[in-house]
Amino acid sequence: MKAYQDASLAPSRRAKALLEEMTLAEKVGQLNQRLYGFRIYERKCVNGEDSIELSEEFRQEVEKYSGLGVLYGLYRADPWADKDYETGLTGVLSKKAYNQVQRYVLEHSRLGIPVMMSSECPHGHQALDGYLLPVNLLAGATFDPAMVRAAYRVSGRQLQNMGVDFALMSMLDVLRDPRWGRSEECYSEDPYLSARMAEAAVIGMQESGPEVVAKHFAAQGEGTGGVNASAARIGERELREIHFPPAAAAIKAGAKGIMAAYNEIDGVYCHANRWLLNDVIRKEMGFDGIVMSDGVAIDQLDSMTGDNVVSGALALQSGVDVGLWDEAFGKLEEAVRRGLVKEAQIDQAVLRVLTLKFERGLFEHPYLEEEGEIHVDYAQNPESVQLAREGLVILKNKNQVLPFWENQASGKKIAVVGPNADDLYNQLGDYTPPLRRDDGITVLDGMKLIFKESDIRFSQGCYLRKRDENLLKEAVDTVKNSDIVICVLGGSSSRFGGASFDTNGAALLDNAAADDKGTLMDCGEGMDCSDLELPDAQLELLKELKETGKTVIAVVICGRPLVLTQVCEIADGVILGFYPGPRGGQAIAEVISGRVAPSGRLPVSLPRSTGQVPVYYNYKNSYRAMTYMDEEAGPLFPFGYGLGYGTFEWGTCSLSTERCNVAALENKGLTISFSVKNTSERGGYIVPQIYVTDVAASTVRRVKELKAFQKVWLDAGQERTVSLQLGKEAFCLWNQKMKYVAEPGVFRIELSDSAQTIWKGEFTLCI
């Protein structure tokens, strides 16, 4: 027995022993993830039994490198992958396909090295029968990391059951410009909230088995003009204050992978930035996993290097360990021959890959048990719908029109109107597989489910981006004969409307043209926009419905912070739901009915107009205010805002100390304690948030920064004391020498909920 075959040895030692046995070609093969897994097979039916046939391209790739490092997207299903329930992998066939692929690799690998599988999981597994969650932006609105952790624990069990080694999860992007099409993949505009959610998602997923590849590093949410993959024109301090905290949190939580971002920062692509991929995440943050490329990103370095071989060498030297769909990493042998990279540098990356394979037990247990179902029942695993419930945000509730109690609605006629009222894919978000209709609940479905004693009437009213006179007239007639109106508006990241795609899967703007029904993917990867208003057709519909004199509740389902100024002027009640997932319609109906107490808080600020962007709350505290001569100051709705149905009485708030030195702060922290009482007749949530403002410092500070929060449930009439803790980091800054320090001085402390200040105090940090 050779050392690498000895399971009693440490994974790192086995990896080193195996590396010594490998040829250069075999090493290069371990760093490649060139294949699109969904294209390596064809599904066939032989004698009534489903099976797959592996492609010649796959066979040649395995032969070329005597093995395979990582295979992307074997289970991926969506219009870009061209896989659905007829052509893709589902049920037992998924596990059989995994075993067939793994068996072929092992049998054609000279050293018997198994392949690792990576799979998209931005909000649940992008696979047939994948357990789907609301998008990250809604998860951020829950202000409930424990719920996010629980949801990803369920998702992780499914991925583990399917043999997925790497869950590719969006969590590092901080949303600074809502024009960006991938806004939905961000948790927040705030680094602290984003970091807490990233930490929870990593822990939840990895508790169930798969390793997390956290993406994207870094500053992809800061693209110029909100354009995808465009330059982030910021400096090191902005990177450290805003964009690094989620990565640091994910790494601290145990993430084994980091995916580099497409964009460049100050003229250097992230995939060619050794300071980012080595100095920051490895030396400063202590990361010891693999750095993965984003799709075709290494080849895109050709625009800078002019030579694909040089691009591969540059990415490797900069810290990328594993490629994705690129040609450049397949040419690393040539790079060695040309003296562009040393074999020792390749060895370092290969060691990381092999160590993970040993840690995951793939050498001893390379195959899956083929029995058992992969489908996860949403009713028995309610974490997805619970996320949706907690993440819906009430923006307006004129005269307490909400909730519309079920007994109050009994026998009433309820009109459910709008282009997003009964379109399942429009509430799911991007990176979504085909979904079995029985697994989804639209708003129309949800209203029928909850308001069983009411007469539910549906009318579409218009298309997403196109007016239709007949649909509009039908909707107005329906509303005239109804008692209350639920008008469901918004956008769509659905890839199921005839869009075409780039080589990396991003939707192409030129070809994603609206069909005769005006269906258009207006959000998601590649769908950046210059106007954040709802389309004219939808605003006209809302106005026409309100002119009937009926009470109108607007529900907006979308993937980015929109300008909802007109919507809030017209409607009596407004509910915002960032793509709430497959059971989102149920959650919305439950909130409307009062079965669920709304508790979502905005994880982003909503602008009054597109020209007001950027409108994030934590801007720099310079002597000039962030105002315009032709627009009201401040956002339409600020970060942290969200209404509920209950009333709460806040009592005395106090600090554990009003003055201490850095050593004492580091040892004991600062505790903010307050009492609160639910004075309403039903239970409900509060979401207390602590903001800190540095009054005087050596660098320009922000007007305020979120440093702590907690989601707290109070039964009717219940009173309790809540305590929130601030550590030393809450008072630290990056000084002029770019050192992370706590400077002595005065800090303002603010306690708020739903953007309402409850208490303000001061704390002094001494030398």
Question: What feature does the model see in each segment?
Answer:
Residues 1-735, 741-757, 762, 766-767:
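Glycoside hydrolase catalytic-domain context in secreted enzymes
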